[in-house]
Design a protein with these regions (language model features):
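Alpha-helical transmembrane segments and their immediate juxtamembrane cytosolic regions
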Residues: 1-228
């Protein structure tokens, strides 16, 4: 996710948006809970495919959506006025290295279901593509988001069934992977985050996000997790 420096574009003029940190912290905790369930399933303590159906599947999709929404929102906060190429490049290298490591490790452990385009791969790609929307009107970004989210319902084709095109997300046969977060429809969540951040900036709503939460004792741990 975004670094501290990237989250605060002009620290002297705007307080840190604590509720963004808290939201990220909650998402990270939710991700840990889901992966704990996945581990229980993997080691035989839960029935096979438990986390791939029903409430667990919905839980996973909510987690991914929240992460990607925050990626888009934070992209505007960090680069909305001017793209900070050095910070962007450093962040992409970090995320790209982590994504490559996950692909390598999962290929070694489970070659039939390895993670070739998971959440980190999506974040890396979306962080680059999202730059194209930083100056566009929010309504245009939301229209594109709607197209991206709905495309898998009407734009699927056998052409995309080839493994090297699976990252796009328009194949007619879903590829096997332990974590699959393709461009379509998931980039749509990033675009919604970008549009939301631009709307918040336009109407001067960002100060709303600088407050805390109740109960207060949860604020510090959630904020710490979200920042680090």
């Amino acid at each position: 996710m975004q670094s501290n420096a990237e989250m605060t574009v002009t620290p002297a003029s705007r307080p840190r948006l604590t509720r963004i940190d808290i939201a990220r912290g909650v998402a990270l905790i939710a991700m840990a809970i889901y992966h704990f369930g996945w581990d229980l399933e993997f080691f035989g303590y839960m029935a096979p495919a438990t986390t791939a159906h029903g409430g667990w599947k919905l839980f996973a999709r909510c987690i991914a959506s929240s992460f990607l929404f925050l990626v888009g929102f934070s992209l505007v906060l960090a680069h909305g006025r001017a793209i900070r190429w050095e910070a962007m490049g450093k962040r992409l290298l970090q995320i790209g290295a982590a994504a490559a490591a996950i692909s390598a490790v999962t290929f070694y452990m489970s070659p039939d279901n390895f993670i070739f385009f998971g959440i980190l791969h999506q974040i890396a790609l979306a962080s680059v593509l999202g730059l194209l929307f930083l100056r566009l009107p929010s309504v245009v970004t939301l229209i594109v988001a709607a197209f991206v989210i709905t495309a898998p319902f009407y734009a699927q084709s056998d052409i995309f069934n080839q493994m090297w095109l699976a990252w796009i997300g328009l194949s007619t046969v879903p590829p096997r992977s332990n974590d699959y977060v393709p461009l379509f429809p998931w980039f749509g969540a990033v675009l919604i985050g970008i549009a939301a951040a631009r709307i918040f900036k336009r109407f001067n709503w960002l100060p709303i996000l600088s407050g805390g939460i109740k109960p207060a004792f949860l604020q510090k741990p959630f904020t710490f997790i979200g920042r680090h």
